[in-house]
Regions:
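A short beta-strand motif characteristic of beta-propeller blades
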Residues: 29-36, 71-77, 114-121, 164-170, ...
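Short loop/turn segments that connect beta-strands within beta-propeller blades
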Residues: 67-72, 107-111, 160-164, 202-207, ...
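Beta-strand-rich domains and repeat architectures in extracellular enzymes and scaffolds
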Residues: 14-63
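Beta-rich, blade/repeat-based domains predominating
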Residues: 34-51, 79-102, 121-139, 146-147, ...
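Short, solvent-exposed loop/turn segments at conserved positions within beta-propeller repeat blades
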Residues: 59-60, 99, 147-154, 193-196, ...
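Loop/turn-rich, solvent-exposed surfaces of beta-rich toroidal or solenoidal domains
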Residues: 197, 208-211, 215-253
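A short loop-to-beta-strand structural motif that recurs across blades of beta-propeller domains
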Residues: 63-65, 102-104, 154-157, 197-199, ...
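Blade/loop signatures of beta-propeller domains
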Residues: 1-28, 150-153
Length: 260
């Protein structure tokens, strides 16, 4: 058990220019999720490009933005959707987890968006949240919708490297959100936002088994969101309402907190 938790302070790197903030554009997402509020953007899904640029999504306004290493912001796509998560696929294309439209593919050169998965066995998704590609190209994504402790029916899906054979790995999640695999591709970690937990899912060719609790995250107005692993196997857990990133070692002990 780690006895001392290191506290770090994050520094602001870049801020969205005022010219890109949408004050008066109608948004059904804002109406549904933040009624009466003035929301000029809601950024999610950060993913690093090979050239060092950072890509993010703007959920309420269906925008995909690129932030160059020098801090320059560019709108790369603007479409009818609620993009929530985004990752690079091994072939160099970007894939988006979209709450309204499912899993999409984005050509980063042209901004063209095409559907990959719009549902499962003639049933629509609840509302896709985030996605992850393992090193071999296997796709994992969460279908969060409005699930929570009152309705623990959120799903985690898997598709092969050729994006075929979509399967449900888990359908009992209380708001599955961010997810990440270990380098070996033998374990999947999933943030369960409403229960403030990180679940560990052993991975097998036939699915998963003995899914367990890896770590409990401090509760609050929200819960754990995006996840990342470093080369030492430490897990980084973003927590929006706490304004912090919690860091856990491979045994599930908290070793650090990054305040934002």
């Amino acid at each position: 058990m780690t006895s001392e938790i290191q506290i770090l302070q994050a520094a602001l790197w870049s801020s969205m220019p005022d010219a890109l903030r949408l004050q008066d554009r109608p948004s059904s997402w804002v109406t549904a999720n933040k009624p009466g509020a003035k929301v000029d953007s809601f950024l999610e899904g950060p993913t690093m490009a090979p050239d060092g640029a950072l890509w993010v999504v703007d959920i309420p306004y269906g925008r995909i933005l690129r932030i160059a290493p020098d801090g320059t912001w560019t709108v790369m796509a603007d479409y009818d959707g609620w993009p929530n998560g985004m990752r690079y696929r091994p072939d160099g294309t970007l894939c988006i987890a979209d709450y309204k439209r499912g899993i999409l593919r984005l050509d980063p050169q042209t901004g063209t968006i095409t559907p990959l998965f719009e549902g499962y066995r003639s049933e629509g998704f609840k509302g896709c949240n985030d996605l992850w590609f393992a090193q071999d190209g296997t796709l994992f994504f969460t279908d969060q919708g409005q699930t929570g402790l009152h309705d623990p029916s959120g799903r985690v899906y898997r598709a092969g490297p050729d994006l075929s054979d979509l399967e449900v790995l888990l359908d009992t999640g209380p708001s599955p959100n961010g997810l990440v695999t270990n380098d070996a591709g033998t374990e999947l970690y999933v943030a369960m936002t409403r229960s403030c937990e990180i679940w560990r899912m052993p991975l097998f060719a036939t699915g998963t088994s003995k899914v367990g609790l890896f770590a409990r995250v401090p509760a609050g107005r929200s819960g754990p969101d995006g996840l990342a692993l470093d080369r030492l196997g430490n897990l980084y857990v973003c927590h929006a309402s706490r304004g912090a990133v919690f860091v856990y070692n491979p045994h599930g002990d908290q070793i650090a907190r990054i305040d934002c």
